[in-house]
């Protein structure tokens, strides 16, 4: 065997032993009957060093606008800014048109009576400007139809009140109350009204006094009392001398006396200097030793007797 053949066989054996793990590839190419050419291809070499970056290509066309992203969470509330400077005061507006009077609704207890109501109690009435009021209607006394605006009966309510309280009204529907001077003005500002005072002493003796042309002025005139004449009643007249006087309270002195009559006689009334009646005075339960500071009616039981029940009421004048 020639040396060339031996070399060839050795190469074949080596190739078989590393066929699965090595990369060389051996090819035998026949040239002639007696000559063979062997080609051995080796493994790939180590990668070379990367070449330099080529020049940038031209900019691509602008893409379409994407969809809006999900809104983020609201941030924390910022600090409150300082109050700005007040602007100039605007001009006073024009006076509005008068409201439409309420049609078909009772404006006093007499109208309720005319519509068939016959039981004394609390009813809703309307002033000429449409204000609704709940009032006590006396449907029995002297033909009925009276609005009761003052009642004393048990001493459960303090009547030594200030101006604002008498303006707005106070008390309880089931016992003692004052309807309110502002309401009295609104209810008597139009028309003519009769006034009636009903008194009951602790012996259950009942007396009364009546007057014509009752009216109460506005607050700007201190709720001045207007009266016509004394028209009768067995209690006698202890109010006519108070006509044309403003209303006085412990904190608003409109009387003719150097001192406050309201403070001195513990009440609130159309005092002169000072009074012949004091039906908003202290509830002293009959005879009392103090002078003129009870629920007094001079022409009735005098200055030292405080009545058990007092009711002051009015209705349209026939």
UniProtKB/Swiss-Prot annotation:
**Glycosites:** 205, 222, 254, 287
Which InterPro entries does the record match to this protein? Collagen, Fibrinogen-like_C, Fibrinogen_a/b/g_C_1, Fibrinogen_a/b/g_C_dom, Fibrinogen_C-term_domain, Fibrinogen_CS
- Which ranges carry the Collagen-like domain? 42-99
Task: Name the Pfam families on file.
Answer: Collagen, Fibrinogen_C
Q: Which cysteines are joined by disulfide bonds?
A: 109-137, 261-274
Binding site residues for Ca(2+): 253, 255, 257
Tissue specificity remark: Expressed in peripheral blood leukocytes. Also detected at lower levels in spleen and lung.
- Using the record, list the residue span of the signal peptide; answer none if the entry has no such feature: 1-19
Q: How is it modified after translation?
A: N-glycosylated.
- Which PROSITE patterns is this protein grouped with? FIBRINOGEN_C_1, FIBRINOGEN_C_2
Where would I find the Fibrinogen C-terminal domain in this sequence?
A: 100-318
Query: Where is the protein localized?
Result: Secreted
Gene Ontology terms for molecular function: antigen binding; carbohydrate binding; carbohydrate derivative binding; metal ion binding; signaling receptor binding
Question: Do the record's keywords include Disulfide bond?
Answer: yes
Instruction: Provide the binding site for a carbohydrate.
Output: 273-275
Family assignment from sequence similarity: Belongs to the ficolin lectin family.
* Family matches, as NCBIfam families: GGGWT_bact
Comment on protein domains: The fibrinogen C-terminal domain mediates calcium-dependent binding to carbohydrates. The domain undergoes a conformational switch at pH under 6.2, and loses its carbohydrate-binding ability.
* Functional summary from the UniProt entry: May function in innate immunity through activation of the lectin complement pathway. Binds to GalNAc and GlcNAc carbohydrate moieties.
In Swiss-Prot or TrEMBL terms, this protein is called Ficolin-1-B
User: What is this organism's lineage?
Assistant: Eukaryota, Metazoa, Chordata, Craniata, Vertebrata
């Amino acid at each position: 065997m020639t040396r060339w053949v031996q070399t060839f066989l050795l190469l074949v054996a080596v190739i078989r032993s590393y066929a699965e793990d090595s990369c060389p590839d051996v090819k035998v190419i026949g040239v002639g009957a007696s000559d063979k050419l062997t080609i051995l291809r080796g493994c790939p070499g180590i990668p070379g060093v990367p070449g330099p970056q080529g020049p940038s290509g031209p900019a691509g066309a602008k893409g379409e606008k994407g969809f809006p992203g999900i809104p983020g969470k609201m941030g924390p509330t910022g600090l409150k800014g300082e109050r700005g400077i007040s602007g100039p005061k605007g001009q006073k507006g024009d006076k509005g048109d008068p409201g439409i009077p309420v049609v078909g609704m009772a404006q006093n207890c007499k109208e309720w009576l005319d519509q068939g109501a016959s039981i004394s109690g609390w009813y809703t009435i309307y002033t000429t400007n449409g204000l609704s009021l709940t009032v006590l209607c006396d449907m029995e006394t002297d033909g009925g139809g009276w609005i009761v605006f003052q009642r004393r009966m048990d001493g459960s309510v303090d009547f030594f009140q200030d101006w604002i309280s008498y303006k707005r009204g106070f008390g309880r529907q089931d016992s003692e109350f004052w309807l309110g001077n502002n309401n009295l003005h609104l209810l008597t500002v139009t028309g003519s009204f009769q006034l009636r005072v009903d008194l009951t002493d602790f012996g259950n003796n009942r007396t009364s006094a009546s007057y014509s042309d009752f009216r109460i002025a506005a607050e700007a005139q201190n709720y001045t009392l207007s009266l016509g004449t004394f028209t009768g009643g067995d209690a006698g007249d202890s109010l006519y001398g108070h006509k044309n006087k403003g209303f006085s309270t412990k904190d608003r002195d409109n009387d003719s006396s150097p001192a406050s009559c309201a403070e001195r006689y513990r009440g609130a009334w159309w005092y002169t200097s000072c009074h012949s009646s004091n039906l908003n005075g202290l509830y002293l339960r009959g005879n009392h030793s103090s002078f003129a500071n009870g629920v007094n009616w001079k022409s009735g039981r005098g200055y030292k007797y405080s009545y058990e029940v007092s009711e002051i009421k009015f209705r349209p004048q026939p």
